[in-house]
A protein has these predicted regions:
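Pepsin/retropepsin-fold aspartyl endopeptidases
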Residues: 1-212
Length: 212
């Protein structure tokens, strides 16, 4: 089960401080992650972001200079979804971080797409790998990972999908599919089978079953 605990002002969390990251900004779960060795990324933990990690373009520019990731592909589509809503449509880059650390937990081969939200986002898929505790009164973020290290290497599709009004639509088109499909096209079949009706919130929390 995906678990987030919110602590009260009266009672501090019992989770070890070794699993704690302080909020960079009081009142919001904005924390500092490490990309590779010595590259800080300030990011917002945002359960409205359906991916594991979404990279703000200004952070992309800074980390590119530091060689913190590899560029995998270029695409065009809708911006990322988060607490601030959906970002403007724009060109997006898909990158891969060889190493991204959330406190003491190491994530290898982390794929991210660039977007234009106010912050780089650490999304809801973090909860696949551990429990999160948010202590707003003390400005603390705790992550209790199930394992000390994860390899997130995975296959990549040439289009990205999202749910709109119960239907699957194409939200991003990557390099090899440009000119074949367009952003906003409706998906009617996956692997030859007609698609069903989808719940937007369920798709963010658990993904789209047919694509797993």
């Amino acid at each position: 089960a995906k678990t987030i605990t919110i602590t009260s002002a009266e009672k501090a969390s019992r989770v070890s401080l070794r699993k704690m990251l302080p909020f960079v900004k009081a009142g919001m779960p904005i924390i500092a992650l490490q990309a590779g060795m010595g590259n800080d990324i300030i990011c917002l933990f945002d359960t409205g972001c359906p991916s594991f990690f979404s990279l703000k373009e200004s952070d992309f520019d800074r980390l590119k200079t530091a060689g913190a990731f590899q560029i995998l592909a270029e695409g065009y589509g809708e911006g990322s979804i988060g607490v601030a809503g959906m970002a403007m449509a724009d060109t997006s880059l898909r990158v891969q971080f060889p190493l991204l650390s959330v406190g003491g937990t190491k994530f290898q081969n982390v794929t991210s797409e660039t977007s234009t939200p106010p912050f780089t986002l650490l999304g809801v898929k973090l909860l696949d790998y551990g429990k999160v505790t948010l202590d707003y009164p003390r400005a603390r973020f705790y992550f209790e990972a199930y394992e000390p290290e994860y390899d997130l290497a995975s296959k990549h599709y040439n289009v990205a999908l999202r749910v709109k009004d119960g239907e699957l639509i194409i939200s991003t088109v990557w390099t090899s599919m440009k000119g074949v499909v367009e952003v906003g096209d409706k998906v009617t079949k996956i692997n030859g089978k007609p698609v069903g009706t989808y719940d937007f919130c369920e798709s963010i929390i658990n993904g789209i079953l047919e694509l797993k």
